[in-house]
Amino acid sequence: MKTRNRKNGYSANTAKQYVDQKQAIHCLSTEFEAQIKFEDGQPTGEIIGHKAWFSQKGLPPFQVKFESEVTLPSYLAMVDFEGLEACEVGYNVYFRANNIKEIK
């Protein structure tokens, strides 16, 4: 049996199942990690995204991918995501967002 709402690819509903947008989310990264494109198991050197780590009370730290350049807030700053989506692959959940903003 499979869940009814599960679909392939990224979804905002999947992200809402894991991350509570009403609770504080903190930035754990001080700089982005570049995601390199691979072809035939070999890196091409082309950067296709940037990843950073975040934390929320009650959750393990999670990584969010940004496909465009965004400004990373300072360490432990409270943040909010624009367009947060998640994708379930096996037992892993992968997140991506369009933008990030610091909450003052």
Regions flagged by a language model, labelled:
Residues 1-104:
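OB-fold and OB-like single-stranded nucleic-acid-recognition modules
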